[in-house]
A protein has these predicted regions:
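Intracellular loop-helix junctions on the cytosolic face of multi-pass helical membrane proteins
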Residues: 1-9, 13, 134-136, 164-311, ...
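Hydrophobic core of transmembrane alpha-helices in multi-pass small-molecule transporters
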Residues: 19, 94, 105-123, 280-281, ...
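Extracellular/periplasmic helix-loop-helix junction of adjacent transmembrane segments
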Residues: 33-66, 140-143
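Central cavity-lining transmembrane alpha-helices of secondary-active solute carriers
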Residues: 53-74, 121, 159, 386-403, ...
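Glycine-rich segments within core transmembrane alpha-helices of 12-TM secondary carriers
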Residues: 63, 140-161, 167-168, 175-186, ...
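Conserved MFS/SLC helix-loop-helix module at the cytosolic interface between two early adjacent transmembrane helices
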Residues: 66-96, 100
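Cytoplasmic membrane-interface "Motif A"-like loop-to-helix N-cap segments
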Residues: 76-88, 135, 139, 269, ...
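C-terminal ends and interior cores of transmembrane alpha-helices
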Residues: 86-107, 404, 420-444
Length: 545
């Protein structure tokens, strides 16, 4: 870029750094649930859906908790460049450690990734924002962030094709190593671009009036860890698993802390903070449903969806290792499953084995069976995880243009109204899956892949109406002295939603009629939408002040 460019030179390097970071993260996430549930003889852990969903939900919940702490530490002590470098290296190590199929390595790697994400994620955005504080670039800040976030989704789109390639050709371990290599490439890219942003790595000294609040919050976090330990180690379980008990117990002191923040506000501030708290609570439900893409919808793609590769694509996809040929039409020793792919257990609770075709054949139409001993040519399950980022890339400019069109005519809806629309549209996406279940007679036959494409397409529109509004809302409404804490509140809401997503997915196998699972999702989103509509007039009054 020339010196007269509308954007700082550092944008390109930060965008590519973020591309590689998201590449690694979403590559890992795309195969994470599959890895946990795949039979051990095929390289996975062989866990049941409920355990895998619980681990998945806890992980993505913690991933959204640590960035607030990492951001505070970078602001107060570590600096942004060091934090980004440390976080990137830790995440790369974590991804590579997943290649060791041992539970100690598995859970250690998750902890390392959670900590690394906390250092990396908030600080690269802050560094980018600091670049645009230069008066030369200030007017193009929104465009710069759009380009930056576009890189996120490009990374999220392409990574699943690499995941499929590495898994099919080399195995699960090399797929995770590829995620780690991607993260290390991101760190190297960041360091190559260092001359273009080292001058904006300026720590913000907290204002004297902010320090007591920040220190109080850090003490609350320490107490939350103690509460979490109590929840984890209490005998039996209250909410279905030790991790859920621990997580919800840990939330108690944090939520109490946020209630004291509200009480400390003056009457004018209480209106804004109360509005944010209301929306925080409501979007928890959105995230709980949205994040099912990595668990319940992955299960639906893997077992209930016709993944047969179009015949015209087979030769090319085989050459590129984008065609899964692991399912062969021959009898083998497999776990005995019921009609909904649940393991049948004996009187002692141990899974029963039998001689049968692989599970994929259970609801495959007989006319689609290949000859005995022949392999099927299937779309790799992880590729379905690229549908959402594809729609984000494709639809974001259209949504921006649509709201820009309304803005010019002074008809643009408020942030609260956009969030309401997002909830309603997301609710409609669950009806696509209800229709899919009914059309396939509750999974007795496999569904067309277009049902999942349609579901992801609709919920992506809902996401674009809701997700970008969160941080924008906080920056508009938050009292200046509480902005950082309110950003943390948005992350906390996302984190709780992510954990509840795992709780929902854990119950997938308990639904004999899978339509009822998606009806439950629809009901939850409609309740959230209804609450928003009932409060909309009051919320809009605050936004319009």
């Amino acid at each position: 870029m020339s010196s007269t460019s509308k954007h700082p030179k550092g944008l390109l390097f930060l965008a590519f750094t973020e591309f590689w970071e998201r590449f690694g993260y979403y590559l890992m996430i795309g195969i994470f649930f599959l890895y946990m549930t795949t039979d051990m003889k095929e390289g996975g852990f062989g866990w049941e859906n409920a355990k895998a969903a619980d681990v998945f939900g806890t992980f993505i919940a913690c991933v959204y908790l640590t960035p607030f702490i990492g951001g505070l530490m970078a602001d107060m002590k570590l600096g942004y460049r060091f934090s980004i470098t440390l976080g990137g290296i830790l995440m790369g190590i974590g991804y590579c450690l997943l290649s060791i199929r041992e539970e100690w390595a598995f859970f250690t790697s998750l902890g390392i990734m959670i900590i690394g994400n906390g250092f990396f994620k908030p600080n690269i955005s802050t560094l980018l924002g600091n670049l645009y504080n230069d008066p030369k670039y200030k007017d193009n800040k929104d465009t710069g962030y759009n380009l930056f976030y576009m890189s996120i989704n490009i990374g999220a789109f392409f990574c699943n094709f690499i995941a499929a390639f590495m898994r099919i050709k080399y195995g699960w371990d090399w797929a995770f190593i590829a995620a780690g290599i991607g993260m290390f490439v991101g760190v190297i890219t960041f360091w190559i671009g260092m001359p273009h942003y080292k001058h904006v790595d300026v720590r913000k000294e907290p204002k004297p009036e902010d320090k007591p609040v920040i220190m109080r919050f850090l003490k609350v976090l320490a107490i939350a860890v103690g509460f979490g330990a109590i929840g984890w180690f209490i005998p039996d379980t209250i909410f279905g698993s030790d991790s859920t008990d621990g997580f919800l117990f840990a939330c108690i002191p944090v939520i109490y802390f946020y209630s004291t923040i509200y009480k400390s506000c003056n009457e004018e501030e209480k209106k804004s903070v109360g509005t944010m708290y209301t929306i925080f609570g409501i979007v928890i439900i959105f995230w709980a449903i949205f994040k099912l893409n990595g668990t319940a919808l992955t299960t639906y793609a893997n077992s209930y969806t016709d993944r047969e590769m179009p015949s015209g694509w087979v030769a090319t996809t085989k050459y590129l290792y984008q065609c899964d040929n692991s399912v062969v039409a021959k009898n083998d020793s497999v776990f005995q499953l019921d009609e909904h792919f649940r393991k049948i257990k004996d009187a002692n609770g141990k899974p029963v084995k039998c001689v049968d075709y692989p599970p994929y054949f259970k609801n495959l139409a007989p006319e689609k069976y290949p000859e005995q001993g022949k392999e099927l040519n299937l779309i790799p399950t992880e590729l379905f995880q690229s549908i959402n980022p594809f729609f984000v890339i494709f639809l974001t400019p259209l949504v921006v243009m649509f709201f820009g069109f309304l803005r010019k005519r002074k008809k643009e809806p408020t942030t609260a109204t956009k969030i309401s629309y997002g909830l309603l549209i997301s609710a409609l996406s669950t009806l696509v899956m209800v229709a899919a279940v009914y059309y396939t007679n509750n999974g007795n036959t496999k569904a067309s892949a277009w049902w999942l494409v349609g579901c992801y397409g609709v919920i992506t529109i809902g996401e674009l109406c809701l997700s970008p509004m969160g941080l924008s809302m906080v920056s508009k409404l938050s009292p200046a002295r509480y902005t950082a804490l309110m950003m943390g509140g948005w992350s906390l809401a996302t984190s709780i939603g992510n954990k509840l997503s795992g709780v929902l997915a854990k119950n997938w196998d308990k639904f004999d009629d899978k339509a009822n699972f998606f009806w439950l999702n629809f009901a939850l989103l409609m309740i959230a939408f209804t609450v928003m509509m009932l409060l909309l007039k009051r919320l809009n009054k605050v936004f319009n002040q």
